[in-house]
């Protein structure tokens, strides 16, 4: 939906079927400007000069979602504004009073239990002395192109009339598309379709007033092209009291019937149209606004079908009869009614009491909110008189349901069935996109806290500035500017146009201008955050509402109060300051204060009137609480937070007084300084005298640090020497390797060896057996052995001499304790007597013979076997389990037996250690050994 797509052209309706011959009727029919359902006029674009020659298709842009359909030739679809004639028919007056206020005040679509302020468009023509003046205005409309009687300050806060300063609707019949009110996403058809056709007849007045066909154009709710089912069914939001759509037949006023309304003919109030001089309803005047006293407001379901024009379809209900009203004001009021949408299930919850002061006044030339706040005693009195007459319904209403619509509405108003312009619509699927009707400059703020109890609110008089509590869903179809706070007129006007209209208004109706000047400001406050309907792409921000534009954001999360408006400004060409799609800035404090002041003034200035009194200002406690809560919630979060922080700061300061602690510079002395106090001067000692504990601690730490264990070196210590001496290790044979921190003690001979290996001779390597054979010889040798020993090869071997110095070892015999060294022989000690010089002491002859026998190349295996047999025989002798005492020992037999029973460990005396092998000698070798 482009903002500049929709251009509104003259919407002059075709001549009425039932009254086409009357020129005055046509003039009233063209009087779309005053009958505009949404004086809040959505300024989609700068309106072109009215052109009656253009076809109807020009009214709708190519991409506009509203259906295009031909003008309906049905008389009921057109508002027939008959010439005003003097008459005394009070019945007609009663009938007329019903649509005046009730239709405008009631917004029948409310889904989430949120109140939508009645959008009564009160086209009060203050500058007119009579309806003839109104005729003049209509006549001059085509040439004027702009209503002079509209003051820039005029606007409606309670959905009555949006500021009329901007060109709401030229007298030429040019109509701006009415804004669409969404109910929780449902596009409720207000009344004005983008094609300039207004269907007020199909809009049932929540107060029981008959549906109004505000403009003389065809009553086709094109704005509601989309069915209510397009959006999710928000019927769940319906309040406890469900409103059923019922057909309410209204009395038909025959042509020529005169409607006499007594009261101030010059009442400056827009809302309180106190005096309507004798008006003749030439067309059929049907009242469909029969309100049920039990909060069951029955409104016929209006289905605007583009293809079939206006089809008033009613689910299980009779079709509403369309009304023809003399007043554009009635039209504008009707537009504030429920957003009729296709397939809307239950449109209205309650019908507000029709306020009699909303009747079309002969002076009603200004569709502004100036009259909203005017609660003058004179006007109140006149409105009361009008109410008394209006509450006396003597209209020729054949339908019993439509009888005393005013009385029913008044009773409902008195009973609190209908709130101040608030009608909660339950299960209303009126959220068709097409509801551009009554695009009130003030979209009702979104109410959250008072949703459940809104039904208790009696709607205040239209003259009263009441915050518009409307559901966010209704705002979807209502293309109003969120930021047009004080300027509820959404029509695009240049500053010159505003000034011109204001001048004209001041000239024609100074009273209205005065009231507008007085009330426009608070209205702007009320408007703030309320005009953020989905549309009004071209609305120009008014200077008055600039201060409160920030609060008209899409979702002002700073204060989610009941008065918070759901602002859809994403599609506006000229987004006001802070009126962006998601401008979540805080509400200005001034706005909240103004809102609260307006509430106070509204609720205190206008007191509860009698049943006949046009003003029913009694608001239920829930509504008042909601209003106050909304005012408080409007306060910016930052200001409230700041105030709370300041209070908390004062409380903490009182509870915890701050104690001034002087900064003391303390010089920290080093540990060394503390420990060396004994060497410091006396003054230092005195200064540290009080620090005895600290000094004691450091002293203990110093003792640990200077412990002897940390200074002890194991190597070379006395204990180390004692240990080595006890182990019989010569310290000279110990080599200390590695670094100083981790010395490694290794034997001296293994210092340069990775592995202990036998020493090799430089000439010829000799095996261990050869070395043993060279040094060992047996005393008793067989000839073979002797021959072997005399072998030249054996003789060629040099004598084995162990070089102690080169090996790095110390000769144990040379050592001091050499005498104590053990004589380790493998097989036992060798008798010195049996040993000879030819043998090496410490080596057994059998072993020697065995080793040398292998060296003999000429010997046979027999000789080797014999040698081994000898060795084994020797082993048997020496390895006996009994110990043989030495010869020199003189022991008794008992001792000898005990010693013999002990294991023989004499092999440990052998100097050469060999692992014993268990060999069983052969019999031959055993025999030879025995021989």
Curated annotation (Swiss-Prot):
A motif (WXXF motif 2) lies at residues 433-436. The modification Phosphoserine is found at residues 151, 395. It comes from the Eukaryota. A motif (WXXF motif 1) lies at residues 28-31. Residues 19-29 have a biased composition (Acidic residues). Residues 516-530 have a biased composition (Basic and acidic residues). One of its GO terms (molecular function) is clathrin binding. Keywords: Cytoplasm, Cytoplasmic vesicle, Phosphoprotein, Protein transport, Repeat, Transport. One of its GO terms (biological process) is intracellular transport. One of its GO terms (cellular component) is AP-1 adaptor complex. Residues 1-49, 371-454, 494-561, 599-636 are annotated as: Disordered. Residues 33-45, 618-631 have a biased composition (Low complexity). Residues 371-381, 439-454 have a biased composition (Polar residues). A motif (WXXF motif 3) lies at residues 476-479. It is found in: Cytoplasm; Cytoplasm, Perinuclear region; Cytoplasmic vesicle, Clathrin-coated vesicle. The modification Phosphothreonine is found at residue 613. A motif (CLTCL1/Clathrin-binding) lies at residues 712-714. Residues 821-825 are annotated as: Clathrin-binding. Self-associates. Interacts with GGA1 (via GAE domain). Interacts with GGA3 (via GAE domain), AP1G1 (via GAE domain) and AP1G2 (via GAE domain). Component of the aftiphilin/p200/gamma-synergin complex, at least composed of AFTPH/aftiphilin, HEATR5B/p200a and SYNRG/gamma-synergin, which plays a role in the AP1G1/AP-1-mediated protein trafficking from early to recycling endosomes. Within the complex interacts with HEATR5B/p200a and SYNRG/gamma-synergin; the interactions are direct. The WXXF motifs mediate binding of accessory proteins to the ear-domain of AP-1, GGAs and AP-2 through hydrophobic interactions. Selective binding to the GAE domains of AP-1 or to the alpha-ear domain of AP-2 is tuned by the acidic context surrounding the motif and the properties of the second residue of the motif itself. Component of clathrin-coated vesicles. Component of the aftiphilin/p200/gamma-synergin complex, which plays roles in AP1G1/AP-1-mediated protein trafficking including the trafficking of transferrin from early to recycling endosomes, and the membrane trafficking of furin and the lysosomal enzyme cathepsin D between the trans-Golgi network (TGN) and endosomes. This is Aftiphilin. The gene is Aftph.
